[in-house]
Regions:
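Short coil/turn motifs at secondary-structure junctions
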Residues: 41-43, 60, 93
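Conserved acetyl-CoA-binding loop-helix of GNAT-fold acetyltransferases
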Residues: 54-57, 63-76, 80, 99-103
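Hydrophobic residues in beta-strands and at strand termini
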Residues: 57, 90, 126-128
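GNAT-family acyltransferases
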Residues: 1-52, 117, 121-128
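Conserved beta-strand-loop-alpha-helix junction that forms the acyl-donor binding cleft
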Residues: 88-98
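Conserved GNAT acetyl-CoA-binding A-motif
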Residues: 78-89
């Protein structure tokens, strides 16, 4: 429940359209393991702010390879959508997320203060 509440806190609200999105849920034995969102047709400045792909894995299921598999699937979907590259971001201290991005071909392109939390974020590009 705490994990779901955290997801709700980070959900954007309002009428502003930020492009189109696909949301994938990862279940195992009827239990939500993780979720992933592909945000496509975003204006470029938003790609570099919120990323084209976002994902999260239930804390008890982390470090089991779920995020790597989810991101791999998302990249296949992005190719099918005709995307040539995707931008992903994570907090600098989120080593697990950085490893997930790197395992899927990510290349670090920028490091800057996060627009929401005042924390340092790293941004990666994955060429498709």
């Amino acid at each position: 429940a705490e994990w779901v509440d955290k997801i709700k806190r980070y959900t954007l609200e309002g009428d502003e359209v930020l492009g189109k999105a696909l949301v994938f849920l990862c279940f195992e034995e009827n239990r939500l393991i993780g979720l992933l969102s592909i945000r496509y047709e975003l204006p470029q400045e938003l790609s570099y702010k919120i990323g084209d792909i976002g994902y999260g894995v239930r804390p008890s299921e982390r470090n089991k390879g779920y995020a790597t598999k989810m991101l791999k699937h998302a990249l296949e979907v992005c190719r099918e959508k005709g995307m040539k590259k995707v931008i992903l971001g994570c907090f600098k201290d989120n080593m697990a997320s950085a490893r997930t991005i790197l395992k899927n071909g990510g290349v670090l392109i920028a490091e800057k203060d996060n627009y929401q939390k005042g924390r340092l974020s790293q941004y990666y590009v994955i060429e498709l």
